[in-house]
Amino acid sequence: MSDEEDYDIAGTLALAGSDSEPESDLNSDNEEVQDEIVSDEDDTKHKPNKKQKLEKGKSKQTFPSLELSDDEAENESKDMASYFVANNPQAKKAKNGSFPSFGFSKFLLTNISKKGFKQPTPIQRKTIPLIMENRDVVGMARTGSGKTAAFTLPLVEKLKSHSPRVGVRAIILSPSRELASQTFKQVKEFSKGTDLRSIVLIGGDSLEEQFSSMMTNPDVIVATPGRFLHLKVEMELELKTVEYIVFDEADRLFEMGFAEQLNELIAALPSSRQSLLFSATLPRSLIDFAKAGLTNPVLVRLDAETKISDQLQMAFFSIKNNEREASLLYVLQEVIKLPLASPEEVKRYSDMEKRDNGSEDEAEDENNNKKKRFKFKKERLPPANMLPSKHSTIIFVPTKHHVEYVTTLLKDAGYLVSYIYGTLDQHARKQQLYQFRIGMTSLLVVTDVAARGIDIPILANVVNYTLPGSSKIFIHRVGRTARAGNSGWAYSIVNEKELPYLLDLELFLGRKVLLTSMHEKKCEMLKTKQSSNYVEPKVSYTDRLVLGSIPRVDIETFQELYENILRNHYELSVVKGVATKGEKLYYRTRQSASQESLKRSKEILSTGNWDDQHLLFGPNLEKEKEKFLTQLLNRKSKETVFEFNKKGNDRDEDSLVEFMHKRRKQIAPIQRRAKEKRELLEKERMAGLTHGIENEILKNDGEIGYSGITIEADEEELQDAFEDADELIEKKKIEKKKSFRDPQYFLSHYAPAAVIQDQQLSLSSSFANDAAKATFDLDNDEKLNANKQVMQWDRKKGNYVNAHSTDKKFIIGESGQKIPATYRSGRFDDWKKQRNLKPTKTGAMEANATNGNDRRFKHKKVASPKLPDKFRDDYHKQKEKVKKAVDSGLKVKGYNKPGQKQELRSTEDIRKAREAKDKKKQKNARPSRKRK
């Protein structure tokens, strides 16, 4: 049997499990989470009573292998898999490096196969075996590498089933609401077929509903730190039963201001827990990770963090001041060739907006006061290996004000746009992301902070509206395209102030900046050298950072278009003013470029060639025009208007002519020296340029960048703080060969705890020193415009007070830190009293009545209709409703069938009854004792 025809254990198990499961189970899960736009693989249709067959030599379509091209030797992964296969008897027959080799249970392998996963990604191959060995792991891999499954699969395998004892067993903390929702969806899908109870706790949801969820005794909690701490303090939760805690996107957890919440939560966790930290980057804030209580952590780091895909092509467009908007419109329309929205698409988009806003869902029936809900067919998400749309593009902007500005501009230009920023409402986030993922909109405008955790598998293009201040942020941005072997483009708009950051990126990536003048000079040298055999070299947009400007004629056309849009839309001009102010604050807080790059950028700007027409647009048609203008500047006759047509005596007697003659004599030496200086600088520049190009030609390097530049962190320092995963496996293999010891029962005479303490107390090898080598910081644009003092009217005090005043009541938490006292408001106690619930104690056995199916109470009461009114248009319609209700057994107030006693009295009967009552009162009533 060849390698291509290997027996797929996971797929076989999945097929065996799917035959025995009814279709209703699959559909019920989809209905339960149909409003969560987080997964790509839920559009697989299951047909009952039909077995699926895998063709030989043809693999089933799987989730894209986003990391298979990483610099990871095959023998290393095989050694790692073989080691853990040897220790797990259930996985000895499984193929090395596959999911069954990790020792997963049958139900988990079935769920993995249903999700479409066939082979684990590199981060999963390295971390899952270590997590199964109960080691604390720090995992570093880029976005989209499968980090979520790397910690979710071991979680489900370890917990296996619901525990009858009260207490949370696993906690997953995410920095954003949408990321928490995505992780919760993954946990639900991988734990399908078990009785594990999982809930999600995010801000913006009802506290009462979350109280109900917590009372179901969940095993797994996926939450954001702020809301989880709120519930912990409000409900006085004990976390002594926690076995497994995950900090997802750990760098953002600390950078977004969750340090206070995390320190409070960490203090309440037991020391025997297993802690996992997963992130796309290693920022400066990792010094706080040492406080998280990791014990002898293992660092799993992939080399792809400082690299970009080989299929990614990049173009950098130089612009002048106030041309950024016009350049963006040109890139979208002429480079990406994104079509404008058709009337049908606009109508479809508006219908979806109305549906999501609830204008149609809340149409009220006038008669029975019940809400009528229109049924609609929810669009399916495309598979993970397909583009949401042909021209799907994500645009990165610096602040949320730019998101509003660019979104308004593109909508006015005729595009359908989705947008996401940090403070956007949770429902609006889901709605905007869903519209982009189903292809309703082709553009998504986001900030760097909001883009973290957004689950978009494949994109066609990435546009950097502004060049980021960090090279690693650039890699994070462009890493969202050119995945899974697909090609992609990244377009960046660069002005003079951002040129130093481009030069920093040149050094970071090891790819040289290529100007149009450099390419032309290279072509001239090759033409001279090769003569008749000359072939113009192709420009590599993957190995070079090609910089140039957009054609001047085209940019002027789009500049006029932008000015017309701005002139005709007042709202756009208002939003532009806000974005301009936000941009100033952003530039003020952005980290500066290196001094060497600043110096080099000034040299490039002085040459005047940095904004030549980009090589992407072919030959420069404006060059002939420029040559003609240059000839006019170099004409022999350089007379001014004062000397023109002045001849003979008139020329000699004119005072202005004499003045210009003297002026030329004075300026001539200065002009001569300036000309000599320019020629000398040009010779020096061309000498260096020619030397570099000649070296490339002689060495046949082509478009290769810097080969000697290294950007990796110091491995010696990292080894002092972490154990390397590969070395750990190799060490275990050697010990297994040479030693007779059984690792499960042998007690060593060494004291590893003391060694760990010595390493932690060492000043030269600390976690903070290691983390400082690889930094990646995102500026939180939400806090840029937060003034230190904002005066607000206090109605109780009757005067203005500081809105950000620290005059608040605090309570001391378990960590000794002060936390807001508003967390403990007594709402849970009131909620519990209303339902007569008894207090539960962590560790005790749960009550049998505890319901963990996450199903809400549904009202099934049928109300009787109102009586028909003869003076209304719907009299006959309402009469039929009343008749049907009476026939079904309902009692309609005031309605009697023919022959029954009339319960309602007429106005004449009421009048007669009142007259009889008055007569009786006059006859029998006693006189009043009150004084008149």
Curated annotation (Swiss-Prot):
InterPro entries: DBP10_C, DDX54/DBP10_DEAD-box_helicase, DEAD/DEAH_box_helicase_dom, DEAD_box_RNA_helicase, Helicase_ATP-bd, Helicase_C-like, P-loop_NTPase, RNA-helicase_DEAD-box_CS. ATP binds at residues 141-148. Keywords: ATP-binding, Helicase, Hydrolase, Nucleotide-binding, Nucleus, Ribosome biogenesis, RNA-binding, rRNA processing. Residues 1-74, 349-375, 860-932 are annotated as: Disordered. Transmembrane segments: none annotated. Its main location: nucleus. A motif (DEAD box) lies at residues 248-251. One of its GO terms (biological process) is maturation of LSU-rRNA from tricistronic rRNA transcript (SSU-rRNA, 5.8S rRNA, LSU-rRNA). A motif (Q motif) lies at residues 97-125. Residues 128-300 form the Helicase ATP-binding domain. GO terms for cellular component: cytosol; nucleolus; preribosome, large subunit precursor. It is found in: Nucleus, Nucleolus. Residues 20-42 have a biased composition (Acidic residues). The keyword rRNA processing applies. GO terms for molecular function: ATP binding; ATP hydrolysis activity; identical protein binding; RNA binding; RNA helicase activity. SMART domains: DBP10CT, DEXDc, HELICc. It catalyses: ATP + H2O = ADP + phosphate + H(+). Residues 349-358, 867-877, 900-918 have a biased composition (Basic and acidic residues). The keyword Manganese does not apply. Its EC number is 3.6.4.13. Residues 369-529 form the Helicase C-terminal domain. Residues 919-932 have a biased composition (Basic residues). ATP-binding RNA helicase involved in the biogenesis of 60S ribosomal subunits and is required for the normal formation of 25S and 5.8S rRNAs. Belongs to the DEAD box helicase family. DDX54/DBP10 subfamily. The Q motif is unique to and characteristic of the DEAD box family of RNA helicases and controls ATP binding and hydrolysis. This is ATP-dependent RNA helicase DBP10. It comes from Debaryomyces hansenii (strain ATCC 36239 / CBS 767 / BCRC 21394 / JCM 1990 / NBRC 0083 / IGC 2968) (Yeast). The lineage of its organism: Eukaryota, Fungi, Dikarya, Ascomycota, Saccharomycotina.
